[in-house]
Structure formats: structure tokens, C-alpha cells
Amino acid sequence: MSEAETLFAALRQSANGDVVEMLERMVRDAPDHALNKMNALDLAAREGLAEERVVAALLNAVALGIFEMTWNVMCLSCAGVLSANKSLKTLDRRQYSCAFCAAGYETTLDNLVEVTFTVSPRVRRIAAHSPDGLSVAEYYRQVFWSSAIDLPADLEKVLDEVTLESVDLPPGERAILSLNLPAGTLIVFDPVTHTAQFLDVSGGETNERQNLSVIFNKVQVPVETIALHPGPLRLTLENRTDSRVLPAVWMANQVLDNLLSRRKPILTAKRLLTNQTFRDLYRTDTLAIGQRLKILSLTFLFSDLKGSTELYERVGDLVAFDLVDEHFRLLQEIIVSERGAVVKTIGDAVMATFETPDRAIAAAIRMREAMSDLGAQRQHQSLRLKIGIHEGSCLAVTLNAQQDYFGQTVNIASRVQSLAASRSIVVTKSVVDNAQTQALLASNGLKPALKRVALSGIEDEVSVYEIS
């Protein structure tokens, strides 16, 4: 049995069999580019498999060494990768900028960071493992662009339609290009160093030769648009890096606009942090101590088992422990099935996160029914949950050696839960205002009741809604 066969046999012990079979087939038969920067959501859609099963299988495959995981900071405008990271620990900048789009971005995990998967060279070597050997078109496909852009099969042909001139420039070398500039906006761009120089070619045509020099190095500096006239240009390109660069002169035409507008869903860092398989595998090695990464919108659910002290007194420690343990098992099962993750348990309480408010609401409705059913089955009618939900911004941090969250959103969610009566779900306005939440509540015949309350540590009163 080969090493790959041994690894896939091990993967079958922890992942869905259909997904494992698909991944093994891809590693064996798929073209190189299909095994580089794999988009888990796109892969699930193409193969007709459940997204969460594909994500879980890929995460377990990373743990076994079959695939490698990359956290790519990407430009929201052009979908180019601004920084590729083997771990969230190396996202150490507060802002990233894209020279091609002249745009800057605050580092957030909501939609700026994608997570992709590439086959490990120990299982199969692919061209992307040696990017210096890639053609220009394949460098753009496999290195520069993120998995958020839906690149056409004939990418090389499409790039030809936007490229006035290009060159593969070795380290330390210089090239001189003679061009005849058309009117319009042109971009001298290199995908390796992310260097861009914009040219505004307008006005009357000239017969006199114009001159321009562009230097490529590892330092990105803001550049102003240079005004030129249509006509001849002597363009000097100098590579001052220790690797090849791939500068090209692009025309900002409709073909380029159409290419950049082709998008598909991605596995975001935020979604992965709310994945239970990820937390189970990587909860202690996600962020560096002291590192803080911002999330603009995350939904927190807190639950607490009402009357647990009386339960211990009534049925005894052994029976009560079994009931509480079963309660934790059921809650985690429901949370995971609604695409959430348990962050931690505190006594009889659970703290969980969800990517969107509606998934937290769906989980909460199921959780309280599951507790009623469990209480009835065990003939202990007092198994009732108090649940609170809030959505807002927060920081992903490391606390007590585990990945956790910090901020006012977490505090409010916890305090909202303390307002819940037996079997009630108390949520904040941001949760109820979510369109998917409203549709879910309506489909379940539930009408939230508004009230204004004071929360400890919060200066102003807060609008909360009770779902009975």
C-alpha cells in the first residue's frame, strides 16, 4: 500500500466516505491546477456534496498531511491574493493594500480572508509547488488570483485580449520594450511583487518617443497615475528582486472588467472559525498569544440549564451528571448541524458561535425542544434552557490557551441570556432585523415580543425580543 493509500484509509475513519472517495479520485486523476487552492464550497457544489462534510473532510485531511491549508488575504475588488499565509498567526498587519486596484483594506475575517486547500507534495507533486516554472497565465490562475474568481478555461486567450505587451523577467535583469500606446487607461502590472503603475493615455497623438521606467522590488509604494499621449513609448522594466517577475501592460477594457466580475462563494476565515471540526482540531493553535483579529459580524448564543442545582438534589449526582452530559451532547449535535461551533462550556452553560443570526435562531428553537423531549424521556420535566443571542463585531483572540472571542458583543450576548425565563429565547434587535431570521420565525409561527431593558455594564437601555 502506497503512502497516499495509507493516508486516505486513515481519513476514512474521521470523514464522510463519499467525500473521501472524491478527494482520493482527484488526487489520483485531476489536473494539477484542480488540486491547488481548492475552494471547498465550489468543490461541494460541483460534486453535489454537503458543504460541511467537504470542509470537515478537508480539515481532517490537512491534519493527516494529505492537504495543506492556506489563509489568503484577498482584494475584494480584483480578487487577487495580497498575502498567502500558512496560519492565521502570520496575519500581523492591520491593513492590506492592492496596488492593482489602488484600494486598502482593514484586516477582518468576514470576507477578506479565504481558506483554501492544496495537495501536499508528499502525496502528489503539482506545478504550483514550483511556481517559478508556471507560465504567465498559470501563474495568474494558480498563484495571483484567489478562489473567489471564476476563471475561464481559456484564461490565456482572455489575457491576450487585455495585454499590450508582457515579459518574463529574471532576477536582476532589465528589459526595454517599444510600444505604440493606444488612447485609454493602461496598467503596468506585475503579479509577483504586486507592483502597479497606471497610465492615463489621452490627448493628441504624438510622434515623439516617450520614456517611462518601472522598477520592481519587494517594497510597495503608492504611485500616481502618469499622463502620456497616444504614440510611441520606450518602457524600461527593471527587476531588483531575487526571483522572476512577470510584468505586463494591460488595457483596462471591457474584457478585463468581465473577467474580474466572475465570482463564486468562498470558505471565509469567519466561517471556518465557526466550524466545529476546525475547533476540535485546531482550537489551541489558531492565533498567537496577544494577536487580535477583527470580525465585523458574528452571532453568539449562550444557553444555561435552568434549575440544575435542584436537579442534583432531586435525583442525585450520578443521574444528574448523566442528564447534564446528555444535554451537552444534544446541544453540540444541534449547533454543529446548524453550521455553528461550541466555543466553550462553563458549568451547565454553553457558548456557541454562528456565521449568521438565522442559524443561531434555528439552533435555539431546536435546542429547547430537544431539552423538553429529554426531560420527558427521563421523567424529569425541569430540563429547560435559558437562551440568549446577539450579533455584532468582536475580536478573535487566544484566552486560556484556546481560540476565543472578546468584546462588547460577547458581553451583551451573555447578559441577554440571563434575562431569559424558562424555555424562552431572548435576542437583540440586530438578530431580529436579519431578513433570514424574520423568515425563519414566520415559518415557525413565532412572534418576538419587544421590551426595553437595562443590562449591567451597558449605559443605555437595550431593545430585546423574547421568543416564547
Where in this protein do the model-derived segments appear?
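N-terminal alpha-helical interaction blocks
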Residues: M1-I66
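Cys/His-rich short segments
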Residues: A63-D132
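Regulatory cytosolic signal-relay segments
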Residues: A227-P230, T236-L296
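Catalytic NTP-binding/metal-coordinating core of nucleotidyl cyclase/transferase enzymes
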Residues: T284-A362
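Catalytic core of nucleotidyl cyclases, primarily class III adenylyl/guanylyl cyclases
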Residues: F302-S303, I334-A362, D373-T409
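Catalytic/regulatory signature loops of cyclic-dinucleotide turnover enzymes
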Residues: L374, H390, V410-D433
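Cytosolic regulatory/linker segments at or just downstream of nucleotide-handling modules
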Residues: R423-S468
